[in-house]
């Protein structure tokens, strides 16, 4: 515990960030170790994971500390803005967290694919390993469908009518629009711990437009509607899980409150049905909190004998997904090496020499 960092600390409590990361208890580090030592894991993937853990991955933020002539700002974002004729002012830092988030437009597709890969594995495992007595219907596997479409195509409309839910949600959204605009305007892309694929989507987008929960589940026995969300987020800091859970709670606040209000209006004080948000959080470098993960699986009535195997699979998926995102970064960076270089041939030669870090 002595090495644990405080929430607002800008440096580790003792020794190094790597020591703090590796010594965190209850974060599935045994599976990180087995993945790193496995012969099935490519040596390049092991090297890149080690660089992330030791804070020595050769992104521009790290390179700038060694070679000040290299700008710490994201080159991929600069190229994207230049191609669109947009201003190149206030470019975000090219940190590991940034290039693994949808905040980097060039990496957005790769990041979304990484999120979907991990969630599809986890959802399939939950569906396949339920208790014999479980009566749980999962809806929302097709991410292309909006919430209204899912409502019309599933049995959930037997419990909650979409028009009634929409009316209540509209009222809640109207009340929250002002505070939501303030929250969005205060977002700082330079804060590494704020980088995430959701970027705090507005309530309206979550409920009525393209953004929606990763999945939903109806428990017919216990009369609960579960809103299921998966967050793949940077786990450099020890508070990664609480921050991701807070973002998920904010993101789905209107939906959960709307469902609860519909139930209260329909059933009065003796509420028969309830709604609950379950947020699974996976760190980009394989962090999965054991207690919280098991708690969620128990809530979804997964066979206890499968908890460890499912968690191991998720850790491996997270690590493989991270490597694919990092390889995407290298492919885009190196594919344009030398193009539009603002600092001349010297910088190109330097970047070429630094390729050994990859």
What does each of the following model-derived ranges do?
Residues 65-66, 109-112, 237-244:
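Conserved, non-catalytic sequence blocks in retroelement Pol enzymes and Pol-derived host proteins
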Residues 96-112, 117-121, 125:
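Conserved pre-catalytic core of RNA-dependent polymerases
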Residues 44, 69-72, 113-121, 142, ...:
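Generic recognition of stable, solvent-exposed alpha-helical segments in well-folded globular domains
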Residues 1-93:
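Helix/loop segments that flank and initiate small ligand/metal-binding modules
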Residues 24-29, 97-104, 226-233:
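Surface-exposed beta-strand-to-loop junctions
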Residues 204-214, 219, 223-226, 230-358:
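Catalytic cores of nucleic-acid endonucleases
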Residues 64, 68, 73, 134-230, ...:
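Active-site metal-binding core of divalent-cation-utilizing nuclease and nuclease-like domains
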């Amino acid at each position: 515990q002595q090495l644990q960092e405080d929430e607002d600390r800008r440096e580790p409590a003792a020794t190094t960030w790597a020591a703090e990361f590796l010594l965190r208890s209850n974060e599935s580090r045994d599976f990180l170790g087995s993945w790193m030592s496995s012969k099935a894991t490519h040596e390049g993937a092991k090297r890149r994971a080690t660089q992330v853990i030791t804070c020595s991955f050769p992104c521009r933020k790290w390179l700038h500390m060694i070679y000040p002539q290299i700008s710490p700002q994201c080159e991929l974002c600069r190229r994207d803005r230049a191609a669109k004729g947009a201003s190149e002012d206030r470019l975000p830092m090219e940190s590991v967290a940034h290039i693994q988030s949808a905040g980097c437009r060039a990496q957005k597709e790769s990041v979304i694919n990484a999120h979907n890969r991990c969630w599809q594995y986890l959802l399939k495992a939950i569906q396949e390993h339920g208790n014999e007595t479980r009566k749980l219907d999962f809806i929302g596997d097709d991410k292309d469908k909006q919430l209204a479409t899912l409502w019309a195509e599933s049995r959930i409309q037997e419990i909650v009518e979409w028009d009634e839910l929409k009316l209540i949600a509209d009222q809640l959204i109207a009340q929250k629009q002002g505070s939501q605009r303030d929250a969005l305007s205060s977002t700082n892309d330079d804060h590494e711990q704020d980088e995430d694929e959701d970027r705090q989507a507005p309530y309206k987008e979550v409920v009525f437009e393209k953004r929606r929960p990763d999945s939903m589940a109806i428990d017919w026995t216990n009369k609960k509607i579960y809103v299921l969300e998966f967050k793949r987020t940077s786990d450099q800091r020890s508070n990664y899980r609480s921050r991701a859970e807070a973002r998920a709670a904010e993101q789905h606040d209107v939906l959960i409150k709307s469902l609860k209000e519909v139930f209260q209006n329909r059933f009065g004080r003796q509420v028969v049905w309830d709604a609950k948000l379950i947020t699974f959080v996976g760190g980009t470098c394989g962090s999965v909190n054991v207690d919280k993960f098991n708690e969620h699986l128990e809530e979804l009535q997964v066979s206890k004998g499968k908890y460890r195997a499912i968690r191991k699979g998720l850790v491996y998926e997270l690590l493989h997904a991270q490597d694919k995102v990092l390889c995407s970064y290298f492919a885009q960076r190196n594919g344009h090496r030398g193009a539009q270089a603002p600092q001349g041939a010297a910088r190109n030669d330097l970047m070429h020499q630094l390729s050994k870090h990859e």
